[in-house]
Structures are given as structure tokens and as C-alpha cells.
């Protein structure tokens, strides 16, 4: 592969590619929305780690974070935005292409 022909690896979204954020994005891609505790359990991330990665995804406008009260307790809901859904779809396409381009 020449320097001019990097293929799909050059197009991999580094924000999504980080393992913790990849888990968050994958979970949210499948469900309409999820609460913070559900994502903690599904990803195995600590409160602080999930919160940190959630902030980065929110800054990129890949997720929407809604805070509400449920039985007088704070409740955080996360949802993929259309931009996030499109970015994840493109990420999957690029990763698939990387593997297809590998020799047998």
C-alpha cells in the first residue's frame, strides 16, 4: 500500500474506535435509548469512566444526554443522535472494508 493509498483505515473515526466509546455506541445503536446504570452494567465501565466517555461523545454531538428525576432521584438517559447513528454506520462500513482488504 502506498502513502497515497491508505484505504479505509485512514477513515476510521478515532473517537468511536476507542474501546469504551465503541461499546457505548454499539449499545445505543441497538436500543432507542438507555439509562446510565444500564450502560454501566452492559459495558463494565465505572461511573467516572462512563461519564468521561459520555461527555466526549456528547461534545461530538454523537449522543444526546437527558437528565430527569425518577422518584425524586436523578436519572440520566442517553440516546444516539442522527449524526451519531450515521457516524457509527460509516465506522462499521470502514471496519468491514479493512477486514475485507486483508489477505487470506
Q: Model segments located where?
A:
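Amphipathic alpha-helical dimerization/coiled-coil segments
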Residues: 1-9, 26, 85-104
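Glycine-centered, phosphate/nucleic-acid-interacting loop/turn motifs that mediate DNA/RNA or nucleotide
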Residues: 61
Amino acid at each position: 500500500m502506498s502513502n497515497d493509498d491508505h484505504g479505509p483505515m485512514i477513515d476510521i473515526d478515532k473517537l468511536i474506535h476507542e474501546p469504551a466509546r465503541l461499546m457505548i455506541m454499539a449499545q445505543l445503536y441497538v436500543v432507542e435509548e438507555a439509562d446510565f446504570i444500564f450502560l454501566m452494567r452492559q459495558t463494565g465501565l465505572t461511573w467516572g469512566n462512563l461519564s468521561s466517555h459520555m461527555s466526549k461523545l456528547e461534545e461530538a454531538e454523537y449522543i444526546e444526554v437527558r437528565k430527569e428525576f425518577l422518584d425524586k432521584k436523578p436519572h440520566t438517559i442517553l440516546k444516539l443522535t442522527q449524526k451519531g447513528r450515521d457516524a457509527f454506520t460509516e465506522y462499521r462500513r470502514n471496519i468491514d472494508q479493512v477486514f475485507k482488504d486483508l489477505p487470506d
